[in-house]
């Protein structure tokens, strides 16, 4: 298992902190006028999702987290678990709702996601950056109803709600950015 020194810390690096796999979100080297230099990092615990800030003296080390990001296909939801499959090996994994978090609102069957495995157990699901979903319900956009140029809420086929422009109607396909939860454009099949 690799060990990382404080001068090797960078955003996205996966390390073990307090026997839990964590991902470094932000890393800052601080050299005060008096005293020893240190590195301040903001980390997300991959098991719980909690974000904490930690400080390490220069030269401290952390072991790497033995996690693997695997592309998997979303199969179905049986009410309790979401089931994913590795397309190459047909190996299946069941993921609970607390691991899936808000990624559930962007998933439809056959979508390919990145599932993070630790000790062969799923601990995080990352949906594709952009998904194409159908609008199941939205208010009709009336002509002249554009004061402020705003939008209107639309419910998608997965149950997610996003703001869309007034010209978009029920039944249309739209492209959504899953990182921000925002409408990007209309989409073709």
Swiss-Prot record:
A biological process term (GO) from this entry: peptide biosynthetic process
Keywords: Cytoplasm, Elongation factor, Hydroxylation, Protein biosynthesis
Post-translational modification N6-(3,6-diaminohexanoyl)-5-hydroxylysine, affected residues: 34
An annotated GO cellular component: cytoplasm
Processing after translation: May be beta-lysylated on the epsilon-amino group of Lys-34 by the combined action of EpmA and EpmB, and then hydroxylated on the C5 position of the same residue by EpmC (if this protein is present). Lysylation is critical for the stimulatory effect of EF-P on peptide-bond formation. The lysylation moiety may extend toward the peptidyltransferase center and stabilize the terminal 3-CCA end of the tRNA. Hydroxylation of the C5 position on Lys-34 may allow additional potential stabilizing hydrogen-bond interactions with the P-tRNA.
SUPFAM superfamilies in UniProt: Nucleic acid-binding proteins, Translation proteins SH3-like domain
Keyword hit for Cytoplasm: yes
Main location: cytoplasm
A Pfam match: Elong-fact-P_C
GO molecular function, one term: translation elongation factor activity
UniProt pathway annotation: Protein biosynthesis; polypeptide chain elongation
Subcellular location: Cytoplasm
Keyword Heme: no
Recorded family membership: Belongs to the elongation factor P family.
Function as written in the Swiss-Prot or TrEMBL entry: Involved in peptide bond synthesis. Alleviates ribosome stalling that occurs when 3 or more consecutive Pro residues or the sequence PPG is present in a protein, possibly by augmenting the peptidyl transferase activity of the ribosome. Modification of Lys-34 is required for alleviation.
PANTHER family: ELONGATION FACTOR P, ELONGATION FACTOR P (EF-P) FAMILY PROTEIN
Name of the molecule in the record: Elongation factor P
Organism the protein comes from: Legionella pneumophila subsp. pneumophila (strain Philadelphia 1 / ATCC 33152 / DSM 7513)
